Amino acid sequence: MTKLGRRNDGGGKSHRSSTKRQRRTSVSVDDPSPGEEEEKTLVVLTDDSDSEEDDKPLGDVLRTCRKRRVSSPKSVTLPNSNVLECPNCFDPLKKPIFQCNNGHLACFLCCIKLKKRCSFCKLPIGDVRCRAMEKVIKAGLVSCSNAIYGCKQSTTYGNQLQSHEKVCVFAPCSCPIKDCNYIGFYKDLINHFRATHKVSPGDINSFVFDRPVIFGLDLDSSDKMVIFVEEKQGNLFVVQGFIGSHGVYATVSHIAPMVPEVRKFSCSLARLRPYSTLRLGLEVKNIQKLRSQEEQPQEDFLLIPSYMVNGDHMKMEISIGDKNDYTHI
């Protein structure tokens, strides 16, 4: 009878494989859980193939199928980046990140300041690293804060983000017109200026680089400034006058962020009188917002002495060029 059983089965291995298929199929039917039903179904499909997994234990096959399941999402969006800040100093978290036994976090500098005592529960902190959060910080990408002004750069959270924003060419610049709240990319500023403020031709002085322009600076106006627009490239410059105890301090500014990618300029600024001229070569500062009249400049200005200030109107001349054109002899 033993021989007949072997002859009818066609071999012991086939009998064991059949039993294994029946046992696994019954498990997939008995469990009503959707997640596990999907997993058991995968096992059944694997068993019906001719692969070598017929001889593997059920536990090994289940583990193999789990690895074949659909991977997790490639990106995650955080509604608020505050979760990536140190809860003590509120600076961006960066390696190393430490945690106490209750799971409270602290950056390296805060651990030193707190003398390795958690600020929330007073337990020791500073010896156990929070590797999970360090991985999140390392893998996370954050958009530049200037994205609303056109920047498309994304960097890892922490030091790299701060480093990028310090040199981002899309850093916002304010319109030089008083009481205007417009803020935007510096190359868009001139379009806003012309479209919104409807200024008359005399209020904007057009010029070409390295060509002198004669203009008047009125000291009786509230803003005491003159705006210049370069005809070809549209760069926006402002000459401001600040009245001080020794005379008038005249400055020249380029409305743009102070970053390496933005072109740097210098200028020749002169006070013209019938029988005398006061001239100075100046470095033109890039600024994102004009100084108020209360902020007297400390550097890079032409001081026009009181004896050369006659009345409220001064005749002046300016020529603007590249960074070293007017500051090096």
Swiss-Prot record:
An example Gene Ontology molecular-function term: SUMO binding
Record EC number: 2.3.2.27
Annotated catalysed reactions: S-ubiquitinyl-[E2 ubiquitin-conjugating enzyme]-L-cysteine + [acceptor protein]-L-lysine = [E2 ubiquitin-conjugating enzyme]-L-cysteine + N(6)-ubiquitinyl-[acceptor protein]-L-lysine
Key words of the record: Metal-binding, Transferase, Ubl conjugation pathway, Zinc, Zinc-finger
Record region (SBD): 136-325
Pathway noted in the entry: Protein modification; protein ubiquitination
Keyword Metal-binding: yes
Comment field on protein domains: The RING-type zinc finger domain is essential for ubiquitin ligase activity. The SBD domain (substrate-binding domain) mediates the homodimerization and the interaction with substrate proteins. It is related to the TRAF family.
Protein name stated in the entry: E3 ubiquitin-protein ligase SINA-like 4
